[in-house]
Amino acid sequence: TVTERPLCHGIQSIQSKRGSSSHNHNPFVALKAHGTTEENGEVYGINLIYSGNFSIEAEVDCLNATRLLAGINPTDFTWRLEPNESFTAPEAVMVYTDKGLGEMSRIFHRTYMKHLIKSPWRDVERPVLINSWEAAYFDFDDDKLVAFAHEAAKMGVDMLVMDDGWFGHRESDDSSLGDWYVNEKKLKGGLSSLIERVNAEGLKFGIWYEPEMISPDSDLYRAHPDWCLHVPNRENSPARLQYVLDMTRKDV
């Protein structure tokens, strides 16, 4: 959903302080002239190439001049620079067009496709994949997945992605994140056997995992409770029954 508001004196902002950007708080704004549509009118777009805490502010001063400030969110952010060290701030991509919001979007799209995306799939057609999640949730084993792959192959699907539930003792969403070893009760022959069987059906094999998260009920958390993001001397705050690993630690 596109949210529009008129500029006014003072500061308006969008920001994220949750450690991520994504669809919740997209690090993007567009300033458009009055009357601009999808096909016509002036528009300036700015997008931060950054997935962490960010802030984008639009300020209109007493002379009706507009200043746009975009970058790392300053809340709780510090960075110590030793002599001769450097710091690289997030890059921003800025677009101007007088052909409306649609052309702005297309310019962003072409720019990212040509200059930002490094995937080998950039210029080729992506495979069609089917994911096990909505079909089985946590209730599957290797035979059920192979049968799933067999039916998917009939529809021209190119890849089966095995989703959540294949690791640790994961039978629901409240355990085992961080224990990235195969649940052999479900995958009796292990990963290699399952992959070979899915490949034999003519499908590639993909696997889901969430390496940045850790469940309180996991071997990893029991061994290293200090590895999750936390504030010393305060009770940890779970979200979705899980914690976030502190990826700034080399041991993590």
Where are these predicted regions, by residue range?
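N-terminal accessory beta-strand-rich subdomains and adjacent acidic, glycine-rich linkers
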Residues: 1-112
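Histidine (H) residue identity feature
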Residues: 9, 23-25, 34, 109, ...
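Long, charged amphipathic helices and adjacent flexible linkers at domain junctions
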Residues: 108-128
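Aromatic-lined carbohydrate-binding/catalytic grooves of carbohydrate-active enzymes
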Residues: 121-252
